[in-house]
Amino acid sequence: MSHFSTVKTKIKHKPQLIEALELLQYDVQENKELINPLDHQHEKVKVDVSIGDDIGFRLNQEGVYELVADIQTWKDPVPPARFLDKVTQQYARM
């Protein structure tokens, strides 16, 4: 069964996160629900920043953004770990 996973980041600032994603040529949307089409219960997760229907970032209780995605159905051509590295590097340049 497929489900959303979360990965902690060190990203704390939403405007810089959005700018980093846009500089990496991603189409950014804010305040969206991710929907897992392969989950029979149609799991939904609210995220603050998304770059598609199944990849996003949400602010956790510690004030840090975490990557939210279904790793099993990852569609981006860049693998998840490399994607997060690229976003983090671009964010650090802000």
Feature names for model-found ranges:
Residues 1-94:
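Interaction-mediating elements
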